[in-house]
UniProtKB/Swiss-Prot annotation:
Oligomer and partners: Monomer.
GO biological process, one term: tRNA wobble guanine modification
GO molecular function, one term: S-adenosylmethionine:tRNA ribosyltransferase-isomerase activity
Gene3D superfamilies xrefs: QueA-like
Reactions catalysed: 7-aminomethyl-7-carbaguanosine(34) in tRNA + S-adenosyl-L-methionine = epoxyqueuosine(34) in tRNA + adenine + L-methionine + 2 H(+)
Species the sequence originates in: Thermosipho melanesiensis (strain DSM 12029 / CIP 104789 / BI429)
Localization annotation: Cytoplasm
Protein's pathway: tRNA modification; tRNA-queuosine biosynthesis
Protein known as: S-adenosylmethionine:tRNA ribosyltransferase-isomerase
Gene name tied to this protein: queA
Family to which this protein belongs: Belongs to the QueA family.
PANTHER family cross-referenced by the UniProt entry: S-ADENOSYLMETHIONINE:TRNA RIBOSYLTRANSFERASE-ISOMERASE
Length: 334
């Protein structure tokens, strides 16, 4: 398939600049894959579509305050975006402007806190060693909001309410729509919950630069699926319930582990790239936001629901002025 097959027109004003309050008041487009039917609801109406015996699989990763502003000894301003911890006090990071940071360059954050560039990393990143603890480092940082969000948004609002495992540089945004009250209603209905971790890296958002999408290489991301979740997944399948993935990160993790030898728990890195045609072996339904044109995430939902149906739904969403991307509205696809 070609990259241009996943393009669509999106007016800039439909890119959500701030989240909806309360979280579950966001709009919800419901897509029935089999009947090719589209409905328009509010996110809290998801209760109507989830049933007793369904398993809602959530990514409980927590976003780190990854964006930090510093300066060189010359006074030149440098922006640091933490990507991944390599070892104690050593991180892979993006730096801006990159031309000003070479091997041995020191970046100061205040009078006592600084980092030194040890080396170049992959694709223009840098390996930085900090002279402060992780806790002190995180106090200097702020939410790494996507570049298309121009408004300031509180760090807490860029986390899911159930986030607990620190390590992502972007939120698993499908989960941002859930409230405590909504989770309680789902629980009362008999919906089960299971948690996994996939630490979202910038690779998820890396633009596809090749017209033949099969040539695109995904960046690998760390995941962990505990034994309790593994057991719940296979019990749900055995009992005829549905595996409902909250977000594309949960989908990628689930469809990674089902292709591995059966284990009690799973821990590793995945670079799975899901695009049409793809055989989904675990995921039966998906909660997700509206994704960028030509993105790997749009390819994933196209693989799940059919490209033509998804592109039709996106065009309808544009006409009906749905809000797009990280703080935008949601889709439920089943």
């Amino acid at each position: 398939m070609k990259l241009s097959d996943f393009d669509y027109y999106l007016p800039e004003e439909l890119i959500a600049q701030k989240p909806v309050e309360p979280r579950d008041a966001s709009r919800l487009m419901v897509l029935n894959r089999k009947e090719k039917k589209i409905e328009h609801k509010i996110f809290r109406n998801i209760v109507e579509y989830l049933h007793e015996g369904d398993l809602l699989v959530r990514n409980v990763t927590k976003v780190i305050p990854a964006r930090i502003y510093g300066r060189k000894e010359t006074g030149a301003k440098i922006e640091v975006l933490l990507l991944e911890k390599i070892s104690e006090n050593v991180w892979e990071a993006l730096v801006k402007p990159g031309s000003k940071v070479k091997k041995g360059t020191k970046i100061y954050f205040d009078d006592e806190s600084y980092c030194v560039c040890l080396d170049w990393g992959d694709e223009g990143s840098r390996i930085l060693e900090f002279n402060i603890t992780e806790e002190e480092l995180f106090k200097l940082g702020e939410a790494p909001l996507p570049p298309y969000v121009k408004n300031k948004v509180s760090f807490e609002r860029y986390q899911t309410i159930y986030s607990r495992e620190t390590g992502s540089v972007a939120a698993p945004t499908a989960g941002l729509h859930f409230t405590e009250d909504l989770l309680k209603k789902l629980e009362e209905k008999g919906v089960e919950f299971a948690d996994l971790v996939l630490h979202v890296g910038l690779g998820t958002f890396r633009p596809v630069k090749v017209e033949n999408i099969t040539e695109h290489k995904m960046h690998s991301e760390s995941y962990y699926v505990p034994n309790e979740t593994v057991k719940k997944i296979f019990e749900t399948k055995k009992n005829g319930g549905r595996i409902v993935a909250v977000g594309t990160t949960s989908v990628r993790t689930l469809e990674t582990i089902v292709r591995l030898e059966r284990k009690e728990s799973y821990h590793g890195k995945t670079d799975i790239f899901i695009y049409p045609p793809f055989e989904f072996k675990l995921v039966d339904a998906l909660i997700t936001n509206f994704h960028l044109p030509k993105s790997t995430l749009l390819m994933l939902v196209s693989a799940f629901a059919g490209r033509e149906f998804i592109m039709e739904a996106y065009n309808i969403a544009v006409k009906m002025k749905y809000r797009f991307f990280s703080f935008g509205n949601a889709c439920f696809i089943y």
